[in-house]
Amino acid sequence: MKVKTAVAIAGLTLKNPVLTASGTVGFGEEYAPYLDLAGLGALVVKTVTLKPRAGNPPPRITETPAGVINAVGLQNPGVEALVRDILPRLARFDVPVIVSIAGETVDEYARLAGRLDGVPGIAALEVNISCPNVKAGGIAFGTEPAMTAAVVRQVRENTRLPVIAKLSPNVTDIRTIALAAAGAGADALSLINTLSAMVIDVERRRPLLGNVFGGLSGPAVRPVAVRAVWQVYQAVELPLIGMGGIMTARDALEFILAGARAVAVGTANLVNPGAAAAVAADLEQYLTEQGIRDINELVGAAHRTGG
């Protein structure tokens, strides 16, 4: 039986619902020897900023039970290097490229969106709103509805590309943030970003990470992420991209049944460079084995069975 794995997200038709999560495969080309990028629904590259960033002081990453905490600090070569050097090289992989952007002010987000508008090789923008707003005392944009709306609105006004707002879980009620992003013009939402976390080195009696705090990802956050997708699916009508601890196709199915139209594989890529392709292949096999002709039949299905 031929099954349909294609999904529609923010005006894009993706061959399957499996994406890479930003920051876990670099700009994609680093993983090309190990991961068939053309077999993915889309490649989400690591976050870029207006100017190059050196990132946080080391140590930047540490393992925890069932997860990883990272504090890389958005190290990247800047948007001009992306446009000039990286995007032209990605064209050979035949996969939609979604560019993640971040700024320290609303104006920086607007300028990034404007700079990338019309650049060949970009399918959509993912707006990383978990960054601190330097004009508001370092409060992350994505933790407050008005700041979320301000960023998304400026990005929307400065680009014709589809806009995907990436939501932070470090909030009281993620539904209010989702509604703010939707009201400001987001075409889709991705969730969740990492959970704020830290580890203390008990021998040295000091925080282990150079930045003190980091972002927790991996299987430890999956139940939190599934809950968030479930709630946001009930609150807004936008397509959702679910992420957070997806290691297998079974994990991905949890997100899809909770309401995600697509999923992003992140931390698993650090363990197995071919993880995202394996999830995509195993999802297709699941559909065949279960006699399900179209993966879209499963989107939000758990809500229709008494949830």
From Swiss-Prot:
It is found in: Cytoplasm. Pfam families: DHO_dh. One of its GO terms (biological process) is 'de novo' pyrimidine nucleobase biosynthetic process. Its cofactor is FMN. GO terms for molecular function: dihydroorotate dehydrogenase (NAD+) activity. InterPro entries: Aldolase_TIM, DHO_dehydrogenase, DHOD_1B, Dihydroorotate_DH_1, Dihydroorotate_DH_1_2, Dihydroorotate_DH_cat, Dihydroorotate_DH_CS, Dihydroorotate_DH_I. It catalyses: (S)-dihydroorotate + NAD(+) = orotate + NADH + H(+). Its EC number is 1.3.1.14. Pathway: Pyrimidine metabolism; UMP biosynthesis via de novo pathway; orotate from (S)-dihydroorotate (NAD(+) route): step 1/1. Substrate binds at K46, N70, A71, V72, G73, L74, N128, N193, T194. This is Dihydroorotate dehydrogenase B (NAD(+)), catalytic subunit. It comes from Desulforudis audaxviator (strain MP104C).
